[in-house]
Amino acid sequence: MALAKTDMLVSPLQISDPFSSFPHSPTMDNYPKLDGAEQFDHHAADAFSEMSLSNEKAVLESSYANHTTRLPSLTYTGRFSLEPAPNSSNTLWPEPLFSLVSGLVGMANVSSSSAPSSSPSSSSSSSSSSSSQSPPLSCSVQSNESSPIYSAAPTFPNSSPEMFPDHSPQPFQNASTASIPYPPPAYPVSKTTFQVPMIPDYLFPQQQGDVSLVSADQKPFQAMENRTQQPSLTPLSTIKAFATQTSQDLKTINSTYQSQIIKPSRMRKYPNRPSKTPPHERPYACPVESCDRRFSRSDELTRHIRIHTGQKPFQCRICMRNFSRSDHLTTHIRTHTGEKPFACDICGRKFARSDERKRHTKIHLRQKDKKADKATPVSIASPVSAYSPSASTSYPSPVPTSYSSPVSSCYPSPVHSSFPSPTTAVTYPSVTSTFQTQCITSFPSSIVTNSYSSPVSSALSDMSVTYSPRTIEIC
């Protein structure tokens, strides 16, 4: 059951005529206001006497009129609401003012053996006796059936109005029989029992407007029930249709990969370079028009398409960074954990990624190539020195035949000084000097000249013996 609330302005020190005029509110129009000309004592403000709701107006005792001291009026402004009590033995509010208002608005079934209505004199006598004792009393309204609380309420020009015109209200019972001091008040067995709690306004920001829209012949609680049973702003069929359409759109995007391209297509670094795998063995082609990549597996194509779409489904749990490939995420996590499973075979240095180790290994290979290049010139120089004696020994015979006469004429003096024999000394020492000159010009190093001096001299000595007759004839 929903709650209905209303604003009421009550003056607890002026209640001589409690039903003369109620303040108008959106839901309680034309109800009498608690207003009177006589005042209570400030000690009697904490407890109110019991009053009856008969067809006649309750007359207060004349002793209240003797008070001439007028206390400042206290105004209580609050918001009261109605809700059904969970059981018939629920307690009222501890303040007598709330008890009075709950008695005015609350409803309860009365048994068939309820007491008859009391006269005005008995009401005034009971109220005087109650005010002299000043006990906290409660008041209640009993009816035979549950009817609309706020039905079409007419104005009350006379002093004995009917609060609920749809049914005949029963008066209050006598204080000695029906009035039970608080706490707890005992209610008769009833079908429905209500009490008036005090609920702040901010809990129901739209409730007052909803109650004001309810017609006079309709229960406000029924209106609240209807409001809670209204369908949502978006029908369920519309939500299902939207969800179906969204799923279809996602399938279309996943099948074509062209409707939602976030990043422009990236050109290949070497577009004309042929792939190792033939095209007929790579059936999965990239659907982007400007990309001619083909793949042999579907997962490779899916991973490649993430480059075009910008999708990064793999997220690091530590730094919340996203990656498009799972292996990138794995290597990234190693930066947090410090794991380095790849070690260099040469120097033992460890790396977190295999490509880093591969790049590091190339450094060692380049160093080996440089060392090999430095060792190559030394190995080439040694065969030249070993080959030169054979060259000198292979050319002794043509030299004396071709250059014998000019050399002898050019260099006569050193030959005579070196060799005493005139015939042999004239020709062959000159050949020796000529051959030495050629060797010096060809090999400027002093080591080469020293290495060739001894074989040439030995060769000339042999040649002098062999060709001595011929040389004599030429001379």
Curated annotation (Swiss-Prot):
Residues 111-140 have a biased composition (Low complexity). A zinc finger (C2H2-type) spans 284-308, 314-336, 342-364. Keywords: Activator, Biological rhythms, Cytoplasm, DNA-binding, Metal-binding, Nucleus, Repeat, Transcription, Transcription regulation, Zinc, Zinc-finger. It is found in: Nucleus; Cytoplasm. Pfam families: DUF3432, DUF3446, zf-C2H2. GO terms for biological process: circadian regulation of gene expression; positive regulation of DNA-templated transcription; positive regulation of transcription by RNA polymerase II; regulation of DNA-templated transcription; regulation of transcription by RNA polymerase II. GO terms for cellular component: cytoplasm; nucleus. The record marks R282, R293, R297, R303, R321, R325, R349, R353, R359 as: Interaction with DNA. One of its GO terms (molecular function) is DNA-binding transcription factor activity, RNA polymerase II-specific. Belongs to the EGR C2H2-type zinc-finger protein family. Binds to DNA motifs with the sequence 5'-GCG(T/G)GGGCG-3' via its C2H2-type zinc fingers. The first, most N-terminal zinc finger binds to the 3'-GCG motif, the middle zinc finger interacts with the central TGG motif, and the C-terminal zinc finger binds to the 5'-GCG motif. Binds double-stranded target DNA, irrespective of the cytosine methylation status. Has reduced affinity for target DNA where the cytosines have been oxidized to 5-hydroxymethylcytosine. Does not bind target DNA where the cytosines have been oxidized to 5-formylcytosine or 5-carboxylcytosine. This is Early growth response protein 1-B. The gene is egr1-b.
